[in-house]
Amino acid sequence: MGTTTNLRSWLYLILLFIVVVGVNAQNRRPKNVQVAVKAKWQGTPLLLEAGELISKESKQLFWEFTDAWLGSDGDDSDCKSARDCLLKISKQASTLLAQPVASLFHFSLTLRSASPRLVLYRQLADESLSSFPHGDDPSATGCCWVDTGSSLFYDVADLQSWLASAPAVGDAVQGPELFDFDHVHFDSRAGSPVAVLYGAVGTDCFRKFHLSLAKAAKEGKVTYVVRPVLPLGCEGKTRPCGAIGARDNVSLAGYGVELALKNMEYKAMDDSAIKKGITLEDPRTEDLSQDVRGFIFSKILDRKPELRSEVMAFRDYLLSSTVSDTLDVWELKDLGHQTAQRIVHASDPLQSMQEINQNFPSVVSSLSRMKLNESIKDEILSNQRMVPPGKALLALNGALLNIEDIDLYMLMDLAHQELSLANHFSKLKIPDGAIRKLLLTTPLPEPDSYRVDFRSVHVTYLNNLEEDDMYKRWRSNINEILMPAFPGQLRYIRKNLFHAVYVIDPATACGLESIETLRSLYENQLPVRFGVILYSTQLIKTIENNGGQIPSSDAVTNAQVKEDLSTMVIRLFLYIKEHHGIQTAFQFLGNLNTLRTESADSSEADIEQEHVDGAFVETILPKVKTLPQDILLKLRQEHTLKEASEASSMFVFKLGLAKLKCSFLMNGLVFDSVEEETLLNAMNEELPKIQEQVYYGQIESHTKVLDKLLSESGLSRYNPQIISGGKNKPRFVSLASSTRKGESMLNDVNYLHSPETSEDVKYVTHLLAADVATKKGMKLLHEGVRYLIGGSKSARLGVLFSSSQNADPHSLLFIKFFEKTASSFSHKEKVLYFLDKLCLFYEREYLLKTSVESASSQMFIDKVLELADEYGLSSKAYRSCLVESVDEELLKRLTKVAQFLSWELGLESDANAIISNGRVIFPVDERTFLGQDLHLLESMEFNQRVKPVQEIIEGIEWQDVDPDLLTSKYFSDVFMFVSSAMATRDRSSESARFEVLNSEYSAVLLGNENATIHIDAVIDPLSPTGQKLASLLQVLQKHVQTSMRIVLNPMSSLVDIPLKNYYRYVLPNTDDYSSTGFDVDGPKAFFANMPLSKTLTMNLDVPEPWLVEPVIAIHDLDNILLENLGDTTTLQAVFEVESLVLTGHCAEKDHEAPRGLQLILGTKNRPHLVDTLVMANLGYWQMKVSPGVWYLQLAPGRSSELYALKGGNDGSQDQSSLKRITIDDLRGKVVHLEVVKRKGKEHEKLLVPSDGDDAVQQNKEGSWNSNFLKWASGFVGGRQQSMKGGPDKEHEKGGRQGKTINIFSIASGHLYERFLKIMILSVLKNTNRPVKFWFIKNYLSPQFKDVIPHMAQEYNFEYELITYKWPSWLHKQKEKQRIIWAYKILFLDVIFPLSLEKVIFVDADQIIRTDMGELYDMDIKGRPLAYTPFCDNNREMDGYKFWKQGFWKEHLRGRPYHISALYVVDLVKFRETAAGDNLRVFYETLSKDPNSLSNLDQDLPNYAQHTVPIFSLPQEWLWCESWCGNATKAKARTIDLCNNPMTKEPKLQGARRIVTEWPDLDLEARKFTAKILGEDVELNEPVAAPATDKPNPLPSNDISEDTEQDLESKAEL
């Protein structure tokens, strides 16, 4: 009784307190904010998403899941709600998965991360249907169909008929194109006709088609593929759970939302009344269990529910008074340390961190009053001696992650990758402890380049810096290389530091031009030792065709065969070198080139015999007494030095350099361009490497630099497929995952070993896929055998015969004999020599002859038996190969191999390829591939991928394995499986030593003995990064078995509040799925009880590839004042992922990025949907895409005339016109392109600067690009966002005629959108020419985007909404307003269509009083930009003219400082002169200094005008009262409402006072807007104040609703 009385008495005190402070419960009712982000595409079924997710674990599991769901296990008739279905689907999948993968699966399912893959299938389904028109009735297609490439079947009976007469395996049939992501039924036989089923599990038609096709696949009739699609309108034809998630657009998670407390020194709030908007989904209820100033209100209400209104009123008051964004300096000092203390001591540290940093303004006061434990502070300060204060680091299993790019989808992919690896290793019986060690292993970085050891007698050096007289005056102190020098400045040291050796055919134009370059650089005393290795292209082709050997010859043959010119030149060169010295020998080559160029029509022409004779005679004539012609004749007849010249070509062949045609080696580094620029770049790249070794004493004055470099890291052979380096990453497949029902096809492989090593553990396994019915396959197999004969202690070789079952009988016989040898005699000493002879015999007698010429099978058998006896093998064993049952087993094995190659490795079933510990080399160039390449591959794979795990595997104590099974083969298999699986990890090779940081007092340690994943983190909890990481780490802790060590690293001695925002990171939840119906509500960001009287601005923190825009937002999201919401309790906004961003980098080897290169992207049917150009900055480019299969190519015109795309990622030189790009997730894609100049175009430039109108006109007429960054129909479900029309065409429309005026502007917030409409009207009312407006769409409100199409139609103008995603490499701005400013200047060259030639930027708050056509047509004298200088008339403002003093006065040196409210961009000149690239370089340098670029969009072009010249417009083109004064107002062509820093007059007030026509334009715009939106227009707007010479003074403290000011005007000062 006493307790109740006490409770009631203090509640009465609470009520009394409320009355005293004057709190009105109704008015102070707390307000909330709710935000959702949806995908642009129509929803996708959750059941189909589950299939895609489970297939990531194993391709086979997709089929098991599908069969289980179609069976009784998938009966969902008892599911009464979306949540029931979610749990049913998750439970079904969990039966096929182990923990914690099953938990991660459930989370990924609620995350909807597989939805984009289904959108991709939808695109392919549309293309399938469009290939076979089905009339006007779309319903005729049904909900399922089968595509065979030649027909579509909507009925199972029709399919059965086709299956009965389907083409046989191996018959040439053009079926649908298959992709890596396709679900191919595991019983499908490679090479059989393809049948693709489009349909959805859960529909009756899918069941029927599936059963029929699965049966046919098992019978070997068809390759059965499923592409899961639920066509529109079929949702009602599926079982209860089959359509969950498909009805509405997908609601996404994995992003952050911030509500920042806005600095209201300048206000940008519209004074129009707030309109009542549509009601969205019911917002969440308030969480009363949260602590508010020590009270838990849920407990109070449980005890006294009848006092609910009084209790809630008190709670509301407490909430409204908790917000603080200011503290005294002394309270701030230890705030970071106090926060760390609160987190570390919490029962749930991660939850505590999230509650603090995501609600910081509400908790900062209580944090600042906490008593600090000095031990925490001391440890933090101690750690900060090793890591900078505030620095954030995150590592997953030892691999550092990029904090800037990290998002939930990336984190889930990385976690899944680690858990899958652990699962595969567990199946190999590897103990848990060893698995954790393996996963913590950091991969070695792939070297960017490799050195080839070319030291040989075949190198002829022209000079020697250490010995030649011409260098004697140079200094010999090697330490001078460490002296500072200007970029590009050479060091002249008498030491052979740089060795440039050209590998050339001296009879080719390229080879002889290289000699000219070499001699020129030598004569100019470049500090390089020059040399050559000469070879004959023709002889190397002969060597390739002769199995890698020089054909044996005799005198008779020599007399009959005409010697090729290259070999002749090499012999003459060697002769002259031997008799007349090196200088004369090089002079001979120079004379040869002179004669070639003088007599040839083209500089590309090769030499003729007369050139050789003439050059020889001319060279030695002054040096000999005998007639040079006689010497030449004698040399020809006697073939003097022939062996030496042939040996030189053989050396080049063995090095593998002949395929490069013309190349040079810089200290062993290979460059396939011989231009002078390439050589100088190579020197600059090599210099820091040499400097480092000199600095550390590894290179001294007596060191032979070349010997040292090549002895340490020189490879014996160059093969670009193996040592591609750079951006072409090797391709890996996990052999550990290539199992079906626990069995791997690789278990049946019998391996061959080098002599006397069959019992040794082999760290590297080469699997040769060889079709021995082809010369390529046989050559590869034979080289493999020779490789083992040559000796390898660390590798074994297995053969996967990829020959077709329909191969000729001799091939099948050869396979049987080879397999028998490998299975029964691999341990025999002479087995390899037997196989060598077997290969030779088979090649000679059967492979190289026609079936008519080849010997009989019996002869083959006899020969094999004879060889077996000769090499000590049992001929009886070979006779057993000939029984019929063996033939059947062989055919089964060939089928298994074909399935393995096709479905597991993604290769053609008859491919000739090499798989070395999972690394795939394909295609293999059999002409140049030697056994030495397998040695090279062995060395590379051992050093890069086996060494890091060798010690761990060798240290394992195998407890769950039968000791009898622990053979060398078992361990070799483990190395093969583990290293191949580890190689497929997508992870950084960077790591950090977290263990050096102390963690006793200031770290959060979350242990888990069974953890597969360990997280190391260094976090500043009071930072934007900390806000996001707090949520991400909680996800890992909840859904993945992780251990964590989180070291807190707050800033010390703060002087300002570190976080002035509220933040929510949106995560999915089971509660998003209805428990009463089949609706999926989707995750949302929910901010409860936000401050009422603070102005907030909303920003989204989305993954890097997302482009988002608001689609539902009644209120001004830039200026949220919740006390103005009235009866509405929750402000709601919905954003949409408008598109994903495809980004990339384009490079030309050994050259700068090909800036200006034009790229186009589209589908197979519509190849040009999007286009862009390549920046000079990192060769960067970007395009907007949706999920789907896209094809990238060079644009028609100069780009494709000069360049070609370089072929795949295996280092091959093939040039392809198309690059296929798959977008099937929400992470976008980064694509690395390499282009090569086309033959004959090597010296042409892509951009040819043009002056004058002719070039512009030509550009216009030949323009191929008229739809830059537009969506075609269906492209991301795109709405029409452009009033169509060519940007620069002359046309007549609705009374407007002439050339179109293009005007560009940007606005954010309702006030500036209001200004923007007025600016549009003022432009249109002053010109009769067509006008097209370009608006940056990122920040436009949904209302504006709804109104502008109607406005365009009413007022007869065109418009287009454009956007560009801020590149990840460019220094980011944090303030929204500064980002907006940056968009005005940083991306002008890439944000517009390439066909747009000129555009005028006009500030949204500007009023136009003239025909803008005059400005558009103005000659700006070839400058890329034209701005108006700041006025100088108003003397009252002299004290504010910053450009006339200090830094700006010194920097400008008499040039004017221009205002950025109006400017013209000549886009043709802007792109030609790389103005955009230059501006971005200046920006990147300056923006990192917080004191630079205070007015970003204005300061940047003014600062850069020495490099990016500006044409100064006449003053009349831009007038603003602050700087110009009223004397010149009458002549003003445009009026800008720029700020007055002296009076700070509100902008709306100034507009009404200064511009007479402004109120009428404003009223007209508001009336039109109200009409379109169906609202009442407010007519009680203040009328224009009388025009005065002085602005009205600022009100004192009482700011009226007209007192509006803007942030943007800071840029205009």
From Swiss-Prot:
Which segments does the entry list as coiled coil? none
| Cell compartment(s), UniProt | Endoplasmic reticulum lumen
- Pathway in which this enzyme or protein is active: Protein modification; protein glycosylation
Q: Which UniProt keywords apply?
A: Endoplasmic reticulum, Glycoprotein, Signal, Transferase
Q: Which GO terms describe its biological process?
A: anthocyanin-containing compound metabolic process; plant-type hypersensitive response; protein glycosylation; response to salicylic acid
Give the sugar-modified residues.
Answer: 249, 373, 1010, 1526
Q: Which residues form the signal peptide?
A: 1-25
Q: What is the effect of changing residue 1309 to E?
A: In ebs1-4; loss of function
Q: Name one GO molecular function term.
A: UDP-glucose:glycoprotein glucosyltransferase activity
Task: Name the InterPro entries on file.
Answer: Glyco_transf_24 (IPR040497), Nucleotide-diphossugar_trans (IPR029044), UDP-g_GGtrans (IPR009448), UGGT_TRXL_1 (IPR040693), UGGT_TRXL_2 (IPR040694), UGGT_TRXL_3 (IPR040692), UGGT_TRXL_4 (IPR040525)
A Pfam family it matches: Thioredoxin_14
> Sorted alphabetically, which PANTHER family does this protein's record hold?
UDP-GLUCOSE GLYCOPROTEIN:GLUCOSYLTRANSFERASE, UDP-GLUCOSE:GLYCOPROTEIN GLUCOSYLTRANSFERASE
Entry's family note:
Belongs to the glycosyltransferase 8 family.
Q: What is this protein called?
A: UDP-glucose:glycoprotein glucosyltransferase
